[in-house]
Amino acid sequence: MRIIMAVLLWMGAGGAWAAPLDTVFANIDGGTIEMSDFRGKPVLVVNTASQCGFTYQYDGLQALYDAYRDRGLVVLAVPSDDFNQELASAEAVKEFCALNFALDLPMADVSRVKGADAHPFYRAVRAETGFVPRWNFNKVLIAPDGAVAGSWGSNVKPRSPKITRQIEAMLP
């Protein structure tokens, strides 16, 4: 009985059995980003960092969002300091992105993406697929039904056909 109760408590606390679209991110601008609001749409979630060699991919993420947002694509940036390459505060991240990239895609507050303290979204992705970001600018595509449709490392650019083919297949 204690084991059953412990499992139920763990699940209720955002355990590994939560689905990716059942999670909530703090928004870098305040408030929250409810992943459930994106049900029925493809969502590309990318862990980002301001001081990384892949930071130039912000341009590609914005271009991807611009190309497909009217058809329903959501691109969500999740700043993270898990690889020691993010700025010291959410305010600094916002300022950096405003000065260097004309981003208007949704952005979460700085979050953990790996390890025991990973955000529940990343724990859910790991539970479903085994995928854990190994560096900044790793990408996870969530299908409109909420399943993980794909994941890619830093070297796969946002506008890569590997990603865009899957996105296009999910859009009206």
Predicted region positions:
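Amphipathic alpha-helical repeat scaffolds
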Residues: N47-Q51
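A short beta-strand-turn-helix
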Residues: D22-P42, A63-Y68
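Sec/Tat signal peptide C-region and signal peptidase I cleavage site
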Residues: G14-A18
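Thiol-/selenol-based redox modules, centered on thioredoxin-like
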Residues: P120-P172
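Terminal helix/beta-alpha structural elements that buttress the NAD(P)+-binding lobe
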Residues: L21-D22, D109, A143
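Hydrophobic beta-strand anchors of alpha/beta hydrolase catalytic cores
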Residues: P42-L44, V75
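Sec-dependent N-terminal signal peptides
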Residues: I3-G12
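Structural microenvironment flanking redox-active thiols in thiol-disulfide oxidoreductases
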Residues: F54-A118
